[in-house]
Amino acid sequence: MSWRWALARRVAALGATSGGGDGATAQAQRLFSSAAALLGRHPPPPSPPHYQIRSKVVGCRGATFVSSRWLHDAQYQVRQDGLSRSEEQQDPFELVADELSLLANRLRSMVAAEVPKLASAAEYFFKVGAEGKRFRPTVLLLMASALKFPLSDSTEVGVLTILANKLRTRQQNIAEITEMIHVASLLHDDVLDDADTRRGVSSLNCIMGNKLSVLAGDFLLSRACVALAALGNTEVVSLMATAVEHLVTGETMQISTSREQRRSMDYYLQKTYYKTASLISNSCKAVAILAGHTADVSMLAYEYGRNLGLAFQLIDDVLDFTGTSASLGKGSLTDIRHGIITAPMLYAMEEFPQLHEVVDRGFDNPANVELALDYLQKSRGIEKTKELAREHANRAIKAIEALPDSDDEDVLTSRRALIDITERVITRTK
């Protein structure tokens, strides 16, 4: 028997000795199931029930971080001011700064390649100074902390700490995998868009050419697949594979739209989900699944990521019209110059139907670009897009507020940080 299974059985034994009778035996079985899932194995015992407390979702598929009352009998009360946004906020990025540095170093080692040119291309956006804000890894690390359960004060806390550290490493792996998939999509997008800047520096295709950029993106995806397979969780593998499929689907939707589709807000939002929100939402859900949470809690994590991603892209589309090339780290008016119609222009078209004809003519002629911008300036397109972004931000915040009750300060701090990130997304200027 491996040490992993021995450890899992030890946790189950702890549950069995915490009380007598059939209830203790069933609880031990649930703990064994959770520990086994954490360590990459999936035995088939039935899932435990989950509970509803007021409007909060409470429950887990088995305790990974175990309280003295074995979690399923615990009902933690969130302090009334626990998630108050009026409290002094800590910088969300600073909360996980040490882990982000660790992840950055691991990512640089993970993308090393035997062929020097491929290695140089693959590590281009992982080099110090070019790695960007690391927005997605930050969100995922904070989500992992926001979903954790407190360790007990028992004498067996050392065993539980081993499990906790093991889980944290696996959740860090999700952050690494997500960032590799994201960077791969950027490399491919820059080739498709013939972009010359990214993150304030020259794009890889501009420096090394399209062929090497495409190969570097493929290489990153292959490394992400290897890391994903190593987790040994088929549900998580399926989620992340779906996110990659959505990236391809969204990009295809963008480059092959009909006239009717270009005018459709529903089509735009579906494409935006595929291109931007699917990766972060499914990654948030993967973090919850690895921790052994119920489907309800995992869906709250997903909903947070989905609405955060949509809000992020809506503001990004606003900034394409209102920002500068220097502030955005890429060219402004990029979308419209490529004939891509986004929310601000869609709202302007609703307000000024004559704009449809301008859009249908395309934007190869600079005069059409200027005419479309004139209509946009007269409309409420920018304002209505910001309002829609706020709606999605509010939904993301509600998802965090509906997470299982906890009185753990680290958990509450992380949840406040996720709410803070949401507010930053819709108030950013770059």
From Swiss-Prot:
Functional summary from the UniProt entry: Involved in the supply of solanesyl diphosphate for ubiquinone-9 (UQ-9) biosynthesis in mitochondria. Farnesyl diphosphate is the preferred substrate.
Keywords: Isoprene biosynthesis, Magnesium, Metal-binding, Mitochondrion, Transferase, Transit peptide
UniProt remark on cofactor binding: Binds 2 Mg(2+) ions per subunit.
UniProt keyword annotation of Magnesium present: yes
Name listed for the protein in its UniProt record: Solanesyl-diphosphate synthase 1, mitochondrial
Protein source organism: Oryza sativa subsp. japonica (Rice)
Binding-site list for isopentenyl diphosphate: K133, R136, H182, R199
Family matches, as InterPro entries: Isoprenoid_synthase_dom_sf (IPR008949), Polyprenyl_synt (IPR000092), Polyprenyl_synt_CS (IPR033749)
